[in-house]
């Protein structure tokens, strides 16, 4: 549905795609200025920690238990009421379908009760715009979306307009961080714990595989690194050895991300004017210091500006969902109340159709 809105917009965002129950109220001014009025996140770390990862059934039940209170707290903290909302933006996928259904159903209920439009947001589109929560970033830009479930390079030319340049052919970078951290006996979530352990380690001590060296595309692969590091971890007996392996893994992931970004920048430069050379990194792995340093070096080398979300908005949050919804609503784009939850939902669906070998799994289109 379309019905352009040029005035200020007050949007409630809801995020329940994995193990964070989050709600946020964001104001988007008519000139595009964004203000986060509240951001409330309910974590489920303690529920999933004994299992070393997210258990979908536990996550969905936890969302059901907490979504009411968290949304109410976000509205209260913003100093507004539900009746003041101009729209509701809820993650509709991709993600764990049980959790996605909880947030989307709650969003539909609020929208229906208040007579407000609903925007069913692609979780990845939320990450794509998340850097705009901390800075005014114009379109177009080159985006590295890197998290526990996703690893993609995208050319973003406008709201919802994404062209995929590269994607992982197996595991995501964040998954590699988490699984290797688990093999090292580190607590969940593993990525931040591995980064902490890596401080002072020797990244050259262990020989770790480098993926897809013979290819000149922008795709990623982390399964070989994950397997090799897990095997080495089984043999380690000292803290120094564990520290060195953590440093090596972090360096290997940062190097591969940097190499593919460098390739993508060269492709992007061929079709864009110098004033449009903007690079954005988003997703949970964007909080890793070694990764940021490697990507900053790519930007300096290729003449790109660098932007990343504030650290609070790197991992899953509802402010980015509210912003993505506000951007769509400002263009008059919103959804019917029969919008469905989509566990698989590519940002660039054309690329998914053009390359089904990389884009489809047993459960449908990959993210």
UniProtKB/Swiss-Prot annotation:
Cofactor(s) essential for the protein: Fe(2+)
Cofactor note as given: Binds 1 Fe(2+) ion per subunit.
Binding annotation for substrate: 145-149, 178, 191, 288
EC identifiers of the protein: 2.3.1.234
GO CC terms, sorted: cytoplasm
A molecular function (GO) term: N(6)-L-threonylcarbamoyladenine synthase activity
InterPro entries: ATPase_NBD, Gcp-like_dom, KAE1/TsaD, TsaD
Pfam families found in the cross-reference section: TsaD (PF00814)
GO BP terms in the entry: tRNA threonylcarbamoyladenosine modification
Top EC class of this enzyme: transferase
Compartments, record wording: Cytoplasm
Chain residues that bind Fe cation: 123, 127, 316
Catalytic activity: L-threonylcarbamoyladenylate + adenosine(37) in tRNA = N(6)-L-threonylcarbamoyladenosine(37) in tRNA + AMP + H(+)
Keywords annotated in UniProt: Acyltransferase, Cytoplasm, Iron, Metal-binding, Transferase, tRNA processing
Family affiliation: Belongs to the KAE1 / TsaD family.
Function text: Required for the formation of a threonylcarbamoyl group on adenosine at position 37 (t(6)A37) in tRNAs that read codons beginning with adenine. Is involved in the transfer of the threonylcarbamoyl moiety of threonylcarbamoyl-AMP (TC-AMP) to the N6 group of A37, together with TsaE and TsaB. TsaD likely plays a direct catalytic role in this reaction.
PANTHER family found in the cross-reference section: TRNA N6-ADENOSINE THREONYLCARBAMOYLTRANSFERASE, TRNA N6-ADENOSINE THREONYLCARBAMOYLTRANSFERASE, MITOCHONDRIAL
Protein name, entry field: tRNA N6-adenosine threonylcarbamoyltransferase
Gene that encodes the chain: tsaD
């Amino acid at each position: 549905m379309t019905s352009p809105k040029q005035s200020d917009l007050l949007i409630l965002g809801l995020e329940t795609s994995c193990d964070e129950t989050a709600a946020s109220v964001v104001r988007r001014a008519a000139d595009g200025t964004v203000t986060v009025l509240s951001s409330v996140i309910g974590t489920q770390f303690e529920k999933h920690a004994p299992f070393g990862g997210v258990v979908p059934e536990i996550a969905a039940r936890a969302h059901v238990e907490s979504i009411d209170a968290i949304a109410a707290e976000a509205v209260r903290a913003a100093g507004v009421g539900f009746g003041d909302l101009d729209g509701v933006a809820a993650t509709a996928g991709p993600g764990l379908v049980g959790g996605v259904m909880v947030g989307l159903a709650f969003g539909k209920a609020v929208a229906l009760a208040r007579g407000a439009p609903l925007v069913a947001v692609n979780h990845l589109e939320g990450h794509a715009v998340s850097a705009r929560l901390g800075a005014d970033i114009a379109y177009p830009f080159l985006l590295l979306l890197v998290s526990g479930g996703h690893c993609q390079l995208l050319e973003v030319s406008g709201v919802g307009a994404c062209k995929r340049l590269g994607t992982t052919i197996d595991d995501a970078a964040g998954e590699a961080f988490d699984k290797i951290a688990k093999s090292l006996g580190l607590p969940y979530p593993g990525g931040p714990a591995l980064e902490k352990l890596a401080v002072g380690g020797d990244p050259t001590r262990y020989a770790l595989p480098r993926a897809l060296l013979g290819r000149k595309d922008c795709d990623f692969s982390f399964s070989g690194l994950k397997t090799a590091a897990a095997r080495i971890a089984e043999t380690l007996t000292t803290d120094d050895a564990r520290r060195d392996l953590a440093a090596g893994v972090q360096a290997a992931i940062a190097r591969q991300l940097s190499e593919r970004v460098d390739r993508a920048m060269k492709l992007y430069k061929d079709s864009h004017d110098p004033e449009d050379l903007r690079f954005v990194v988003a997703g949970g792995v964007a909080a890793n210091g070694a990764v940021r340093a490697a990507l900053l070096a790519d930007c300096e080398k290729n003449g790109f500006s660098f932007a990343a979300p504030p650290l609070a908005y790197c991992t899953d949050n509802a402010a980015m969902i509210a912003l993505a919804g506000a951007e769509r609503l400002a263009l008059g784009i919103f959804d019917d109340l029969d919008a469905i939850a989509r566990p698989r939902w590519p940002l660039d669906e054309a690329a998914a159709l053009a390359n089904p070998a990389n884009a489809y799994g047993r459960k449908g289109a990959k993210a």
